[in-house]
Amino acid sequence: MYNGILPVFKDRGLTSHDVVFKLRKILKTKKVGHTGTLDPEVSGVLPICIGSATKVSDYIMEMGKTYKATVSLGITTTTEDQTGEILEQTAVNEQDVSAKSIDDVLQQFKGELIQIPPMYSSVKVNGKKLYEYARNNQVVERPERKVNIYQINRISDLRFVDDTCQFDMIVECGKGTYIRTLATDIGKALGLPAHMSKLTRTQSGGFDINESLTLEDIKSLHEHDTLLEKLFPIEYGLKGIEQILITDNAIKGKILNGQKFYKAEFKQNIDDIVIMVDNETHKVLAIYEPHPEKLDEIKPKKVFN
């Protein structure tokens, strides 16, 4: 039985659930989960949690992501990417846009932004996913969401192809950011129709695309009993959360039994979630959080036993 995190390379054409389904068959276990949906037409790294590591998937999802995207100026589509039908089309040439004007606009999108999710997305409104409304030609009011763009930079020359202007950019962002919506909004800021014509996720949850494994890699490693050495430990998915090292065996036992504690029993000031770590093995024992009612106590959120 495997317990850990695998950075998987998702090919275009597969859904995130397809990857989970295939891995369940390869590894012969149902305890497999992904760390946030990656659209079918997007390739890149998809961290997969296996066994007890499924308990930390929410924390991996909260970590930042990095994308390499191609923006095409001159065309907007129904889906905001290359798969949709054309909504608006304008010929773009070298007199209409420059590298400097694009670079200036990109920096306007750095920081906290308000985004409206695209109609073709899995965001739910009134219990239904937006793409279900879109397929029935229904447009509904979509909730605004705050997203964070930490870095955004053009990384290629401008390419003028078939009356469009294309360029590549790198975007470092927080959870819930729609890059295709960002591409469309960049076009609006330039006064031009735009869409995202290609997208690759290069980093997610602290994992890089260069260390990710294909499904074929994983199948081969599993068959040769060498997959275990490629697994990242559960602790890797909890980076950035304060640790409390536990040396007392009696306290370890209480933690593994899911008992509550008084905050005063620990030296640290506990104002947020913390992870209890075995001082000898450096393995995570549990995740604890402040009690919502008893302010002087902490209670277990997840226990790893």
From Swiss-Prot:
InterPro entries to which the protein is assigned, alphabetical: PsdUridine_synth_cat_dom_sf (IPR020103), PsdUridine_synth_N (IPR002501), tRNA_psdUridine_synth_TruB (IPR014780), TruB_C (IPR032819)
A matching Pfam family: TruB_C_2
Active site (record annotation): 39
Top-level taxon in the UniProt lineage: Bacteria
Keyword annotations of the record: Isomerase, tRNA processing
Any single GO BP term: mRNA pseudouridine synthesis
E.C. designation(s): 5.4.99.25
Record's keyword annotation contains tRNA processing: yes
Catalytic activity: uridine(55) in tRNA = pseudouridine(55) in tRNA
Summary of the function given for this chain in its UniProt record: Responsible for synthesis of pseudouridine from uracil-55 in the psi GC loop of transfer RNAs.
HAMAP family: TruB_bact
The protein's name: tRNA pseudouridine synthase B
Organism the protein comes from: Staphylococcus saprophyticus subsp. saprophyticus (strain ATCC 15305 / DSM 20229 / NCIMB 8711 / NCTC 7292 / S-41)
Lineage: Bacteria, Bacillati, Bacillota, Bacilli, Bacillales
